[in-house]
Amino acid sequence: MKIDVIIPVHRPGAELLELLDRLNGQSLLPRRIIIMNTRSKVQVEKILADRENVSVVSLEREEFDHGGTRDRAARLSDADYLLFMTQDALPADEYLLERLFRPFSDRRVKAAYARQLPREDCGELERYTRSFNYPKESRIKQLTDLPELGIKTFFCSNACAMYERATYLSQGGFIRRTIFNEDMIYAGGLVKSGYAIAYAADACVIHSHNYSGSEQFRRNFDLAVSQVDHPEVFSGIASEGEGIRLVKKTAAHCLRIGKP
């Protein structure tokens, strides 16, 4: 059983080296780490030249695409499983790969994503949002969960998510030419094809952002656009209720702790 890790990067700093060190210290080791590097002044090839299991594929900035770049890397791999990560997500311990792989023992499961824990400098709103989207309880999600979970049935995050490669290829992989949300679009297709997605709450990465109001608005706007652009996945599945539930719970949390 072989696992390859795929990480798109752009102007990476020291956090990438720490990420690679943590990946190569896992109880279940990756066979190969494929870095999809968008060219910049940072000489990624030179920085990583001494890393034996790291391959760097460089592309021009205009070539980068959230879905297409990841799909290109997937097709360079012959591993059994593909772990996609972002350059700013760090394994919380040495058991990330082992625990993320475990749900695949259920033959329905063709994708599994990790729990995201906030960084120490994370703001209170983002910290609460992380706990809302990434709770302490693991769950297997499939088509029969749609009445209960709605659009969250399709939720999956390529900040840290593993996929069975054979099914990934047979399903057509990530959508090409998409500004955002390639993970959820693919996951929705999986569920609609009769497969399941696992949320592995014991597989943890440290990953959060301190978005400004305008940045959060832009992200939400892009998310909405991606859903409109893919009615074959999202048509007839309401997302407003989940958003309203998050707003209400966040407001109640802020009132309870006395922070805006």
PLM regions with names:
Residues 60-77:
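Glycine-rich, basic loop-to-helix element that forms the pyrophosphate-binding segment
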Residues 12-25:
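Short, well-formed alpha-helical segments that are part of the catalytic scaffolds
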Residues 143-163, 179:
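A recurrent flexible, glycine/aromatic-enriched loop bordering the glycosyltransferase active site
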Residues 179-186:
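Acidic donor-binding loop at a coil-to-helix junction in glycosyltransferase catalytic cores
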Residues 219-225, 229, 236-260:
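Non-catalytic, C-terminal membrane-associated alpha-helical segments of glycosyltransferases
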Residues 90, 94-127:
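Conserved donor NDP-sugar-binding/catalytic core segment of glycosyltransferases
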Residues 82:
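Short aromatic/hydrophobic "clamp" motif used to bind/position activated sugar donors
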Residues 37-45, 90:
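A conserved acidic beta->alpha catalytic loop
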